[in-house]
């Protein structure tokens, strides 16, 4: 049994710079009377993963040195460190996503973890899933901010985006996607599932990577993305003049002025089900 426990230390937010992860394994007894024990009554081995706990960003290491974490310091001697998962700070998939993909038996090639295909399985009846071999991606509404030297993602996903606003924008955009062989399905406000062959081998960056950073390192090439770059440009023009964004700006909210594709890919075989293997749980 593998449990990926996600927790942030203090108020550090080094999300985009996170390059490596240390995984710790617990082989002891978990008191069933505790909140953690109630989640895992069988007391199987547990792995603890703490995303965003450190980064190469300036000031991070001095900040970590001064942190007082008595509970974590008590816990670490009880755990066994596993091999370090090293990576580049500009990798497309953050380390905690790579670790979870490995635990689930999913492909974990950088930028090609098929998270959207996994999510599509969960909603197979609602979206009339025909085959596990379809290619999927997440489409997330976001706000891009242009400066003199770069374009960065200021907000992803969009905050306070109502379900009705998301549905209205989806209805406006869906016909344009369909012209390019892509079908959109609502998932959450501002976050949709997209099905289309263009996503089969499209490398995409996690929203965790691009939040607050320049888009340049993670923009797919024209060769990789095909008509998607043109489609995104068309959708930006549509969003620029859409009444939903006029209403958002009138109430002081950021407009949704762009899209971000992520989690693209295909499940490795027809028989893979979620979760795989059994016992993987995220808390």
What residue spans do the PLM features occupy?
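…; additionally, a secondary subgroup of soluble metalloenzymes is captured
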Residues: 18-283
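Extreme N-terminal basic, low-complexity initiation segments
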Residues: 2-15
């Amino acid at each position: 049994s593998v449990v990926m426990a996600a927790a942030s230390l203090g108020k550090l937010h080094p999300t985009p710079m996170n390059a490596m992860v240390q995984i710790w394994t617990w082989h002891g007894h978990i008191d069933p009377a505790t909140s953690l024990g109630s989640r895992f009554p069988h007391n199987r081995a547990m792995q603890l993963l703490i995303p965003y706990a450190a980064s190469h960003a300036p000031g991070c290491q001095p900040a970590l040195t001064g942190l007082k974490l008595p509970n974590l310091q008590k816990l670490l001697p009880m755990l066994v460190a596993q091999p370090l998962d090293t990576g580049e700070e500009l990798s497309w998939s953050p380390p905690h996503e790579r670790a979870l993909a490995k635990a689930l038996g999913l492909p974990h090639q950088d930028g090609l973890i098929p998270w959207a295909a996994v999510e599509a399985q969960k909603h197979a009846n609602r979206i009339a899933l025909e085959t596990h071999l379809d290619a999927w991606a997440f489409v997330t509404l976001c706000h891009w901010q242009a400066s003199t030297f770069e374009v960065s993602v200021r907000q992803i996903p969009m905050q306070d985006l109502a379900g009705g606003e998301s549905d209205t924008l989806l209805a406006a955009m869906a016909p344009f996607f369909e012209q390019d062989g892509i079908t959109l399905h609502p998932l959450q406000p501002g976050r949709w599932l997209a099905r289309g062959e263009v996503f089969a081998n499209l490398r995409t960056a996690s929203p965790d990577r691009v939040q607050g950073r320049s888009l340049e390192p993670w923009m797919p090439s024209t060769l990789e993305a095909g008509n998607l770059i043109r489609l995104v440009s068309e959708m930006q023009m549509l969003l620029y003049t859409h009444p939903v964004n006029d209403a958002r700006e009138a109430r002081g909210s950021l407009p949704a002025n762009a899209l971000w594709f992520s989690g693209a890919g295909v499940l490795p075989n027809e028989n893979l089900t979620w979760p795989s293997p059994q016992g993987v749980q995220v808390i």
